[in-house]
Structure formats: C-alpha cells, structure tokens
From Swiss-Prot:
Presence of the UniProt keyword Nucleotide-binding in the record: yes
One Pfam entry name: GAD
Record organism: Cytophaga hutchinsonii (strain ATCC 33406 / DSM 1761 / CIP 103989 / NBRC 15051 / NCIMB 9469 / D465)
Residues the record lists as binding L-aspartate: 174, 220, 445, 488
Listed InterPro entries: Aa-tRNA-synt_II, aa-tRNA-synth_II, aa-tRNA-synth_II/BPL/LPL, Asp-tRNA-ligase_1, Asp-tRNA-ligase_1_N, Asp/Asn-tRNA-synth_IIb, AspRS_core, GAD-like_sf
Main localization of the protein described in the UniProt heading: cytoplasm
EC number: 6.1.1.12
Protein name: Aspartate--tRNA ligase
Assembly and interaction partners: Homodimer.
Length: 616
C-alpha cells in the first residue's frame, strides 16, 4: 500500500505516529517561514506542515512546486496543532512532513473543488470526475450506496432473491418510446432497452420464484423535462401468493427500515388514502401531507349571488391559510399573479380575510354580504387571523390549480422543510381513463394491473368500465411519488379482456405479449409487486430536489453526456455491419427510416412522474 492511513482518520491519539498519506492537494499556503498543505482524499482532509530551517531544502523546494489537485504521497510525524480547527474531524492534528513525492501533476481545474464551487452546471458535468471530488457530491454517492446496501439487507432478511433480468429485450412500448438496439446477427431487427422489467418479473413468479427483487437500470426515450434522466434506477420487486395488504406491509417495512438506518428517523405508520379523496381534498394523486390546508368546496353557498365568475363555474373551492390574515395587499397580489402564471393557468383568485377583531372582508364584497362571508368562513372552519383563498372553474382543472397554490403557500410558510417527512399510501386508483380525443380507454397504470372487481370488469358494458377501480397503490413521500405497483392479472382470459378494452386486436396482443399470455396457461400464481424510484428516494433522503446530484455520471437536460460527448455519430463501417442506412433529419440529429413508431396503450401524465416508473 502506498499509504498507511487516509486523510480523514488521524486524531489527537495518533500524535507521535509516523504516517504516510496519499491524496490531492486542495490548497497550499506559503507564509515564507511556514508552508501548509491541505491534503484531501475520499475520507477527509489533513493539514501537512513544513517549516523553514527545520524541513530540508529539498522538501521545501518540492512543496513550492505543488499546485491545486496535484496527487502526492507524504510521510511524516503526527503532531498536535497549535491553532486547532473544530470544524474538521482532523482539526486537532497536523503532519510534519519528512518525505514528499509528487505522484502526478494537475492542470489548473476549471472550477473550485469546494462545497461552494464557482462552476456552472455544464462545466461541472463536462468535468464530472473533478466534480466528484467535492465533498458534497461524494456524500451523495455514499448515501446512495447506503440506501442500496440497506435495501438488500432488508429484502434478503425477508427471503427475496436478487435476480437479474435481460437488458436486450423485445420492443413492447410501455408509455414512452423505447431505446432500440440494432442486431448485427439479425439484419433489420432490433432489441429494445427495458423501460421496466415488468413482464420478466411476472414470468419469474410463474417460474416459482415467489420473492424477487432487483436494483435495476431502466431506460426511457422521452422528451426530456427538468430533472429527468433517460436512464434511471428502480428497486424492482414482486411477490407471489399475496394480497394488497401483504404488499403494503412488506414495503412500508422497507421504507421504514431505510429511514431508520439511513436517516436515523423513526417513520410513523404510513396512512392510506383513497385516490378519490386525494383528488377531492388535495387536487393531486400525490399530496404533500406535511401540512394541512385541505380543500373546502363552496359551490353551493356562493353561487346565485350575482358574481358571474362563481356562477359560471362548475366548482368553487378554496383553502384556509391559517394565521395569514395579516398578509399585505402586495403579498396577496403576488399570490394572485402566481396562480395566473401559464404554468398554473387560473384566471384569478378571490380572498376572504378574517381579521383579528372578528370582521370579515373580501375581494368580492360587492357581491357578498357580511352574513354571506360568515357562511364561507364557517364552511372553512376559519378563525380570526385566517386568510381564505378561493379559485373557481372546471372541476379537475381548478383542483390542480389549487394544489399548486396550496404547495406555494406551504413553501412560503415554511411548512415543507426538507428534514420533515410524511409518507402516504394512495390506493384504489381508477383502472381506466377515457381519452376524449382518441375515443377509447387507456390504462391508468399499465395493462397488467388487476381490476379490484374482476367480475364487474368482465361483465360491465364498455361505456361503464370507468367505474372499475384498480388493485393499485402508490407510495408518496413529501408530495413526491417514490414508488408504485399493483396486484397483477394472472389469468389469460382477464388479460385478453384487458388488451381488448385497450384497443388491441387479438393479433397485436399475441405479437407483443404472446409469451406472457402463454405463460399464464402453465399455472401462473396470484402475484403483485411494485417499484421504487431509487434515484428519487436518494434525493429525498439527501434533502435536495435534483436526482442528478445522486447519479455518478448523469446526463444533462438534453439527454447528453457532455463529458464523453454522447450520443454521437457512428462510422459508416459500423452502420454497414448493422445493415442500417442513416438519414440526417436536421443538424445534430439522425433519423432511421422505415421504423414505424407504435404507441403502447397506456395513458398516464408522465410529466408528473417523479421517478421515471412506467410499469411497476
């Protein structure tokens, strides 16, 4: 070994020891008579010292050649520091150098390798190997490792087997486009990279592996939005001979284990909420329950008073911002402008102020008497000091707008701290949703989700299938969907019916999923599962919004790896071997002709998926 200790382990008890350290030079301070070198490695930082008149001339000369990020090997004696640094674990000691070797020099880095860096995102992504030297980034990857390790510990203790599933699979598009891989041995044919191991884990259940898991890379070729990655990681799980309650208990146990071991936080028992209630009271299928402000419907008591905006709305609904009656007009106007932003889309906002003296005043006093305002306040269960904020319009749309307002108010009031955690199971999703434009049914989750009432699903008329609920569940933490899954269909007749409802012909279903349908004829057990968004889970534990901070080598928001310049053009020889002709569609992009894009019959708002799970 080139070193005897790391740069993070020496303490006052090590004084008088001779040690050898290796690492990167963080900074050099030359005060003439004294030279200090801060040496950094993955484990921490240690201060090295040389002294004019006591250190050899050769050592002093070598030390004065050092620059930022030089790799060195230093041998010396541990001594007690005169000016201790309580902010450093090694701050009680320093190493008086007796030998110094430069193992490698370094160009001047393009940004400061410090917790507070001056490097922009693109620069840090281009030089990611330098960014990874920063303590903040290193800690994120250590946390990711810990989450991975503790996941395996819990699942192994519960008799789960970690089984790897194929990466080169058949293209069965699952809500987004597949990444396709040409087959040289089979000209004109393509593999796809998996968006999820969905069908393979179901086949493992058919094979008798009753408890499976995998921490697995998945891929989705979709239009990128902020904080999305074309490749992402799932904790993918499946169980046989279970009901929904068994799944919820098992994986609530996993999440509580992770909070305990990773965050040293005792997560309370996770409550359950019906999808219908989540939408009614929070306007979202992933409500943030760290704070209250449930929606209150007012339609029946505010219409027919001459206020046209309310009279023409099919829903009038609001929230009570407790203790906010002292908001200035400027602050209220700022909230009005917030809801009128294109991203929210409301036309305006009505407010009712319940002053500390008990009087009520609103932005629509012209239409509502004091008694009317009192009825509104009573409906909100408001008290003096509260501020009621009201939106109106189309039902589903206005609930979404009020959800945005609720979260904004919660953030402004400090009710959504990163170190506070509230988890929630959302259950009983609709099985299907009807696309008015396409005039057909789409699966709310995916086509392998079992109806809660199978008999009703099989017997109801086509136009009444919207009343059937799914045996599906999502885990939400702090308003972020971190995982989800379902009880699976395991009977071929039911699965065929699902494909039929979704608009598949018998031939299309057989071509895409014939292998699964056939497997169901060989004794498929009842089974269920879910997948957690591993990257998103790590970001929640780390208290940051970006999943990119927890991925060693992420892509940028354009799906590019600017460090290795990928994706890139491949040479003509490779294309010829693959029997592919390439047509340049526009600058910087290539198109492969004669590949028909197929759309999988899943309709879900993936713009609001936080962890890139398409099938789980």
């Amino acid at each position: 070994m080139l070193r005897s200790q790391t740069c993070g382990e020496l303490r006052i008890s090590d004084v008088n020891k001779e040690v050898t350290l290796c690492g990167w030079v963080a900074r050099v301070r030359d005060k003439g008579g004294m030279i200090w070198v801060d040496l950094r490695d993955r484990y921490g930082m240690t201060q090295l010292i040389l002294e004019e008149g006591k250190s050899s001339a050769e050592l002093l000369e070598t030390s004065r050649k050092l620059g930022r990020e030089f790799v060195i090997r230093a041998t010396g004696n541990v001594i007690e520091r005169v000016a201790k640094n309580p902010k450093m674990p090694t701050g009680d000691i320093e190493v008086k150098i007796t030998a110094l070797t430069i193992l490698n020099e370094s160009k001047t880095p393009p940004f400061l390798i410090e917790d507070e860096t001056d490097g922009g995102d693109e620069t840090r992504m281009k030089y990611r190997y330098l960014d990874l030297r920063r303590d903040a980034v290193r800690k994120n990857l250590e946390l990711r490792h810990k989450v991975s390790r503790e996941t395996r510990t819990y699942l192994d203790a519960n008799n789960f087997l970690e089984v790897e599933t194929p990466v080169l699979i058949k293209s069965t598009p699952e809500g987004a486009r597949d990444f396709v891989v040409p087959s040289r041995m089979n000209p004109g044919q393509f593999y796809a990279l998996p968006q999820s191991p969905q069908t393979f884990k179901q086949l493992l259940m058919v094979a008798g592996f009753d408890r499976y898991f995998q921490i697995v890379k998945c891929f989705r070729d979709e239009d990128l939005r902020a904080d999305r990655q074309p490749e992402f990681t799932q904790i993918d799980c499946e169980m046989s001979f279970v009901e929904q309650e068994d799944i919820l208990n098992m994986f609530e146990g996993l999440v509580r284990h992770l909070f305990k071991t990773v965050k040293e936080f005792d997560l309370p028992e996770v409550p359950r909420m019906l999808f219908a209630d989540a939408m009614k009271y929070y306007g979202s299928d992933k409500p943030d329950i760290r704070f209250g402000m449930k929606f209150v419907e007012l339609t029946d008591i505010v219409q027919s008073q001459g206020f046209q905006v309310f009279d023409e709305a099919n829903l009038v609904v609001g929230i009570n911002a407790e203790g906010c009656a002292e908001y200035t007009r400027k602050e209220i106007d700022a909230l009005t402008e917030f809801v009128k932003r294109p991203q929210v889309g409301a036309k305006g906002m009505v407010w009712v102020r319940y002053a500390a003296d008990g009087t009520l005043k609103s932005s629509v006093d012209k239409f509502y008497s004091a008694d009317d305002l009192k009825k509104i306040a009573e409906r909100f269960n408001a008290k003096p000091g509260d501020l009621m904020l009201i939106l109106s319009g189309n039902g589903n749309k206005v609930r979404g707008q009020l959800n945005d307002l609720r979260l904004e108010i919660g953030s402004r009031l400090g009710l959504r701290p990163k170190d506070k955690f509230a988890a929630l199971w959302v259950i009983d999703f609709p099985l299907l949703e009807f696309g008015e434009e396409e005039q057909r049914w789409f699966a709310m989750h995916h086509p392998f989700t079992s109806p809660k009432d199978i008999d009703a699903f099989m017997k109801l008329p086509f136009d009444q299938l919207g009343s059937v609920n799914a045996n599906a569940y999502d885990l939400v933490i702090n308003g972020v969907e971190v995982g989800g899954g379902s009880i699976r269909i395991y009977d071929r007749t039911v699965q065929n019916k699902m494909f039929e409802v979704l608009g598949f012909t018998e031939e299309e279903a057989k071509a895409q999923f014939g292998f699964l349908l056939e497997a169901f004829e060989y004794g498929a057990p009842p089974h269920a599962g879910l997948a957690f968004g591993f990257d998103r889970l790590c970001s929640i534990f780390g208290g940051v919004d970006s999943i990119r901070d927890f991925i060693a080598f992420p892509k940028n928001n354009s799906g590019r790896d600017v460090m290795i310049d990928s994706p890139s053009v491949i040479d003509d020889k490779q294309l010829k071997e693959l029997s592919i002709d390439v047509k340049v569609a526009d600058k910087g992009r290539i198109g492969i002709p004669n590949i028909i894009e197929e759309t999988f019959n899943v309709k879900r708002d993936t713009s609001k998926d936080d962890h890139n799970i398409t099938a789980n």
